[in-house]
């Protein structure tokens, strides 16, 4: 059964806003999936912010284009705009972060392993992402993974009053 769910998990770009779970249930489900993902020394440094409704639309229609425009020409942004607008048609976006404060604490607590914690944090983030993607597939959602966070990370911290120690890893666009 698990193997079948993994085999069914694919990148889905045909986007819709059709809900499968109630918003509260979906957010709780995603948080539980991330919590169950293994992490080195059980650090549990992965964090998610789930954007639904207007916040999801704002991310793809305002925040990402504003961030991209600071890095590319207007012409390049206009070429990208249809892709970003397509992501806005999805049901929601899951922002994956790693909490660097927890990683630093582990480095201080276990100095002999200090150099490994940043890498292990990335492993944990990847596991949280695949657990989430596979878990969404299991209940009928599709998804695709995006990487605009290197451009939007600081804006997101301000927009959602996130801790300075949060480092964005990816965005998962979820569809039904």
How would you describe each model-predicted region?
Residues 1-92:
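N-terminal amphipathic, basic helical "cap/leader" segment at the start of enzyme domains
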Residues 5, 93-95, 171-173:
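Conserved hydrophobic/aromatic beta-strand scaffold that supports enzyme active sites
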Residues 30, 34, 100, 109-157:
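Small-aliphatic-rich amphipathic alpha-helix that forms the alpha element of a beta-alpha
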Residues 43-46, 138, 169:
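Short secondary-structure junction motifs
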Residues 60-62, 104-109:
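Short, conserved acidic/polar surface loops in the N-terminal third of protein domains
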Residues 67-74, 108-117, 160:
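Short, surface-exposed loop/helix-turn segments at secondary-structure junctions
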Residues 68-71, 84-86, 159-176:
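A glycine-rich helix N-cap at a beta->alpha junction
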Residues 90-101:
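Active-site-adjacent structural patch at catalytic or cofactor/ligand-binding sites
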